[in-house]
Every structure is written in C-alpha cells, then in structure tokens.
Design a protein with these regions (language model features):
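Cysteine-cluster motifs in flexible loop/terminal segments that predominantly coordinate metals
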Residues: 47, 94-144
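Cofactor-binding loop segments of dinucleotide-utilizing enzymes, especially the Rossmann-like FAD-
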Residues: 18, 42, 78, 184, ...
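Glycine/charged-rich beta-loop-alpha catalytic/anionic-binding loops adjacent to active sites
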Residues: 142-152
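Short N-terminal strand-loop motif that marks the start
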Residues: 1-72, 134
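Glycine-rich beta-strand-centered segment in the early N-terminal region that forms part
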Residues: 30-44, 57-105, 147-149
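Mid-domain Rossmann-like dinucleotide-binding core that forms the NAD(H)/NADP(H) cofactor-binding site
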Residues: 150-219
C-alpha cells in the first residue's frame, strides 16, 4: 500500500479516561493509505453513546475511549487512489463499516460484521473513532460531501440522520399516514422531523416537560 506523506505530524484529541474524566492527548497522526483522506475537523457533536459513557452508563464500552463520530470538516489531503474528493471539500463523517462483508455489500452498513470499532484498540492503546480531534485520517468510504453553506454542527447530524432515514424507508412510511414516535430525545426528534418531511402525521410521546417544549419549538 502506498503511504502518503503529509506535513501535519500530530493530532490532538479528547480522551475519556474513566467515568466523568476527560483529557486532551497528543498522538502521532496515523499514516495515510492510498484510499484515505486527512480531515481538519470543524465540529463533532456529542452523541448519546459519548455522553452515556461519560456518565458511567456505558462502561462496558471500556476505557480509554477516544470518542466522537458525528463530525464534519475540511479535506486537507487525499490518498493517491481516492476518487470524487478533493482538497478543500467540506465533508461529514459516516458510519464506520468495512465495505467488504455481505451486510455492507447489501446496503446494510449498520450491521457490518467488522465495524465494532469500540471493542478494538489502536496500535497505541486507544479505543474509539477519534472524532473529538483537530485532525483525523479516515477511509474515503466513511465521508460524504456537504454543501458549503451548511453549518458544521448541522452537518455532524448526517450520520444519525442517515440511520433515521434508513428506518423510515424500512417501515415504508407514506404521506398522510399517522406515525407514533416514542420519546423526544435527539433520535426521537430526528425521527419525527423526518417523518414529517415525508408527509406523515406524527404523534410524539414524551413525559419530560423540557423535552416537550423543545419538540414544540421545532414544530
């Protein structure tokens, strides 16, 4: 595999060392392969999995965890065999999938047989996606172009929104159908807004007053 030399040698990233304890660490930037891209991160949203592990509710995922996977940024370098992407493109991160197994080839990347990166250690002893970083090296299959006008924080929702759209397609939602969404957390709201965009009549259930008010503010 051809190795691409880049000027940037180090990356800084957020690391969850244990429940409620975070640190900023430095590591060598991984060497780029011919199908990889180097991204300068603009934003990385905090997913429920990240927050849950910070609170100690997902300690089974293990520590130290270099979390963050709902991000967006700007391409700074491309591998020699990367197609469709150029330096300066704004991109969002996608789900980490191998692209080779039967599930990936059938369009079910969310069920990838080799994507459980949370259970894998990097060569220097960390777990995770390294999204909470200034720079990332990722396979080009893990990114998608975004409009230049789209705010970076909104672009970071591409990965969870893709999950929602997949689910809406699986239930074959149709305009004017009544759909019930249980819970007005982040994913519940994304489901409700997506179903509304599909033309469905949405009933959203929630017991927490602050989440109810938040849902109302979004229409």
């Amino acid at each position: 595999m051809e190795v691409i030399t880049v000027e940037i040698k180090k990356m800084h990233f957020g690391l969850l060392t244990r429940k409620g304890k975070t640190e900023i660490r430095e590591r060598e930037l991984p060497k780029m392969g011919e199908f990889d891209v180097l991204i300068k991160q603009e934003t990385c949203n905090i997913c429920t999995t990240d927050y849950g592990q910070f609170l100690g509710l997902r300690e089974h995922q293990g520590y130290p965890m270099a979390g963050g996977h709902e991000g967006s940024g700007i391409i700074k370098e491309v591998g020699s065999k990367v197609k469709g992407y150029n330096i300066g493109d704004r991109v969002a991160l996608l789900y980490d999938a191998c692209g080779r197994c039967d599930m990936c080839k059938s369009g079910q990347e969310g069920r990838c047989a080799d994507a459980d990166i949370l259970d894998k250690f990097s060569e220097d002893g960390y777990k995770g996606f390294f999204g909470f970083a200034d720079y990332m090296v990722v396979p080009s299959r893990r990114i998608a172009k975004i409009n230049k006008e789209l705010p970076s924080a909104e672009a970071g929702f591409l990965e969870p929104l893709a999950t929602v759209v997949k689910g809406v397609k699986l239930v074959k939602a149709k305009p004017n159908e009544t759909m019930v969404v249980i819970g007005a957390g982040t994913m519940g709201l994304l489901n409700a807004l997506t179903l509304k965009a599909y033309g469905c009549k949405v009933i959203l259930t929630e017991s927490f007053e602050n989440k109810i008010e938040n849902a109302k503010s979004l229409g």
